[in-house]
């Protein structure tokens, strides 16, 4: 169809539904620089205020998928699956989940992102491993998935380039938090990766982008409905982010946590519950398990047998990391020069955590970004974070700061003390997995 961008913008501005061919033409022009930044910004703002129905969101997602390459894994011989998280603090689930389900017979070509603001990024964590290539060429990406079972890499310029352009414009026009635009951005990249099934981790709480359960439900429902409408079988779990998920926040410190988890050292934790819940969902979707209970048992066996650890080690090695990384992580991971415990301000029960603020402490230490061009220090962060609901005595460490200087460490200790609330009575703690959306 002939494209008149301002007519499409006007129709959406006036609250009218756009036809799939209108959306496809607009996005195709956007990806080929046939749409000005002003027109793209106006379109994003019109969608922000007027919204989109399901059919429009499906059309937008498919158009953004088709703006670049779409990978095919027909020759892989395994079900192709992935998981996406909306982001939080201490969320290193992908690092363990990919090798666990790969050990159970799935192929996981995981396209991940970097951290921005208070949330950590999977790619930043992996880059704490010297030599690990988060941007391999397609041949190495395919070879890794084929030979290892999983590969965690970054988005290349050839996958959903329209999303990259539109996101950059949304970022500077206050249109990031639009459900239709979030949905299309997430799913276009996943569809371009050639997945057969997808699970979504929609986080809710004071450390998540979605602060209320109702908002999380709206986003989860939109993602599941649009993904299924686009031909990608998808389920979502809404998970709690009112405290860090793992006991570390940072980059090298979360890799250490990952290795401890894969070695069986995090049994019974909230992190284990979330990881195994997502593994079970993926295995049921791929018909490797008949029930979620069977899927969880298969995932637990992959973990306890050491097969998941072995696959993680192979992934690191094939993608350029040290071949003996698992045996000698301390030889390769950067260590901060200043390590300082955070004492409990008083005796009582850890009752609350300002999780977003805790994530910002990591950024202030140098372990995160406030703008995409910022450089990260992989060594800094927070470790040994106690979970909510435990009893502490005054002066007992509730976390440990890893900093580049004494001044940074002392400032972080004070900030972390302020992040935690200590009560006289044991608090009620939310479950780690709150709801399942299908």
From Swiss-Prot:
What are the boundaries of the signal sequence? none
Q: Which residues cross the membrane?
A: none
MF terms per GO, please?
1,4-alpha-oligoglucan phosphorylase activity; thymidine phosphorylase activity
- GO annotation, cellular component aspect: cytosol
Spell out the reaction equation it catalyses.
thymidine + phosphate = 2-deoxy-alpha-D-ribose 1-phosphate + thymine
E.C. numbers: 2.4.2.4
Q: Name one GO biological process term.
A: pyrimidine nucleobase metabolic process
Keywords in UniProt for this one?
A: Glycosyltransferase, Transferase
Pathway field: Pyrimidine metabolism; dTMP biosynthesis via salvage pathway; dTMP from thymine: step 1/2
Under the heading InterPro entries, the entry gives: Glycosyl_Trfase_fam3 (IPR000312), Glycosyl_Trfase_fam3_N_dom (IPR017459), Glycosyl_Trfase_fam3_N_dom_sf (IPR036320), Nuc_phospho_transferase (IPR035902), PYNP-like_C_sf (IPR036566), PYNP_C (IPR013102), Pyrmidine_PPas_bac/euk (IPR018090), Pyrmidine_PPase_CS (IPR017872)
The answer, when asked if Glycosyltransferase is one of the entry's keywords, is yes
Output the Gene3D superfamilies linked to this UniProt entry: Nucleoside phosphorylase/phosphoribosyltransferase catalytic domain, Pyrimidine nucleoside phosphorylase-like, C-terminal domain, Transferase, Pyrimidine Nucleoside Phosphorylase, Chain C
Quaternary structure and interacting proteins, as annotated: Homodimer.
Which family does the record claim for this protein? Answer: Belongs to the thymidine/pyrimidine-nucleoside phosphorylase family.
Q: What does this protein do?
A: The enzymes which catalyze the reversible phosphorolysis of pyrimidine nucleosides are involved in the degradation of these compounds and in their utilization as carbon and energy sources, or in the rescue of pyrimidine bases for nucleotide synthesis.
Q: Which PANTHER family match?
A: THYMIDINE PHOSPHORYLASE
Spell out the protein name for this chain.
Thymidine phosphorylase
Q: Which organism is it from?
A: Agrobacterium fabrum (strain C58 / ATCC 33970)
The taxonomic lineage of its organism, from the top, reads: Bacteria, Pseudomonadati, Pseudomonadota, Alphaproteobacteria, Hyphomicrobiales
């Amino acid at each position: 169809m002939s494209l008149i961008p301002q007519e499409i913008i006007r129709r959406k501005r006036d609250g009218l539904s756009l036809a799939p061919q209108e959306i496809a033409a607009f996005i195709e022009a956007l990806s080929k620089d046939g749409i000005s930044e002003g027109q793209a910004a106006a379109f994003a703002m019109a969608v922000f205020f007027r919204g989109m129905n399901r059919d429009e969101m499906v059309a937008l997602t498919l158009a953004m998928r088709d703006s670049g390459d779409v990978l095919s894994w027909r020759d892989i011989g395994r079900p192709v699956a992935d998981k996406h998280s909306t982001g939080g603090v201490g969320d290193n689930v992908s690092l363990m989940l990919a090798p666990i389900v790969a050990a159970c017979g799935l192929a996981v070509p995981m396209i991940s992102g970097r951290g921005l603001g208070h949330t950590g990024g999977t790619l930043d964590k992996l880059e704490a491993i010297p030599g690990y290539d988060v941007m391999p060429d397609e041949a190495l990406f395919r070879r890794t998935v084929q030979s290892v079972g999983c590969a965690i890499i970054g988005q290349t310029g050839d996958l959903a380039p329209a999303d990259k352009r539109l996101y950059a414009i949304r970022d500077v026009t206050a249109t990031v938090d639009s459900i239709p635009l979030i949905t299309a951005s997430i799913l276009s990249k996943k569809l371009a990766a050639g997945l057969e099934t997808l699970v979504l981790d929609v986080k809710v709480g004071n450390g998540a982008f979605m602060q209320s359960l109702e908002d999380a439900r709206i986003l989860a429902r939109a993602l599941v409905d649009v993904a299924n409408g686009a031909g990608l079988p998808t389920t979502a779990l809404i998970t709690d982010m009112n405290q860090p998920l793992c006991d570390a926040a940072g980059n090298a410190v979360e890799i250490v946590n990952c290795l401890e988890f894969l070695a069986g050292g995090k049994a019974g934790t909230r992190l284990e519950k979330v990881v195994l819940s997502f593994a079970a969902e993926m295995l049921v979707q791929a018909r490797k398990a008949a029930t979620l209970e069977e899927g969880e048992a298969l995932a637990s066996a992959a973990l306890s047998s050491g097969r998941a650890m072995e696959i993680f080690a192979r992934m690191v090695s094939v993608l350029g990391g040290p071949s003996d990384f698992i045996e000698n992580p301390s030889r390769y991971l950067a260590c901060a020069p200043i390590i300082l415990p955070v004492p409990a301000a008083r005796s009582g029960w850890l009752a609350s955590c300002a999780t977003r603020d805790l994530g910002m402490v990591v950024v202030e230490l140098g372990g995160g970004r406030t703008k995409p061009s910022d450089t990260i220090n992989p060594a800094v962060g927070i470790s040994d974070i106690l979970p909510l609901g435990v009893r502490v005595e005054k002066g007992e460490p509730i976390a440990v700061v890893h900093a580049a200087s004494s001044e940074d460490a002392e400032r972080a200790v004070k900030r972390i003390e302020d992040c935690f609330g200590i009560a006289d009575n044991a608090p009620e703690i939310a479950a780690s997995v709150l709801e399942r959306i299908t």
